Regions:
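Short, flexible active-site loop motifs that bind/organize anionic cofactors or intermediates
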Residues: 11-14, 49, 121
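Hydrophobic pocket/interface hotspot
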Residues: 9, 24, 32, 55, ...
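A solvent-exposed, acidic/Ser-Thr-rich amphipathic alpha-helical stretch
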Residues: 29-84
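Short, low-complexity N-terminal intrinsically disordered segments enriched in polar/charged residues
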Residues: 1-30, 137
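Charged/polar, solvent-exposed surface patches and flexible loops
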Residues: 11, 26, 61, 65, ...
C-alpha cells in the first residue's frame, strides 16, 4: 500500500507544480480535510489561509486564495516517507505575498492520510509565523 500511496503523492505534487488544480482535486476524497491552522490559530488572523478547509469546495477555496495572494518562488519536496495509510513529505518552500511584496521561506513537513488512493486529510507543518508576518502591511 505504501508504494501506491507514494505514487499518488507524487502525482499530487506534479499537479500542484504544473498548476493543474482540477487534477490535484481528483486525488482528494469528497470528505477531505486540510488543516492549515497554526498553533496559535485565531479566527480572523492576518493570514487568510490559516483555517480548517473541508470538502473539495473548501480545498478549491484554499487553492484560489493561495494562488491569488502568493507567488511560488520555490517549492521543493525533498524526501518522502510512507506507511500503510500516510505519506510524509519533507521539503522547502519560498513564497512572496503579492499585496505586501514580502517574501517568506520555510522548511516543511506535510502529512497526508490516504484511503483507497485518495487523500482524506492533509496537515502541513512549517513556519506559520513567517507566513503571517509576510501578509502584514
Amino acid at each position: 500500500m505504501s508504494d501506491r500511496n507514494l505514487a499518488v503523492f507524487t502525482q499530487i505534487f506534479e499537479r500542484f507544480s504544473a498548476g493543474d488544480m482540477p487534477g490535484l482535486l481528483s486525488f482528494q476524497s469528497d470528505e477531505i480535510v486540510w488543516d492549515y491552522r497554526s498553533e496559535d490559530f485565531t479566527e480572523g488572523m492576518d493570514n487568510p489561509l490559516n483555517n480548517l478547509w473541508k470538502g473539495k469546495s473548501g480545498i478549491t477555496q484554499f487553492l484560489n486564495t493561495l494562488l491569488t495572494t502568493q507567488e511560488v518562488i520555490e517549492f521543493e519536496p525533498r524526501d518522502f516517507f510512507a506507511n500503510e495509510d500516510q505519506v510524509v513529505a519533507i521539503g522547502h518552500s519560498h513564497w512572496k505575498v503579492i499585496e505586501t511584496g514580502k517574501e517568506w521561506a520555510s522548511d516543511f513537513a506535510m502529512v497526508f492520510t490516504l484511503k483507497e488512493g485518495l487523500v482524506t486529510h492533509w496537515r502541513p507543518i512549517f513556519d506559520y509565523t513567517a507566513e503571517r508576518i509576510a501578509y502584514q502591511s
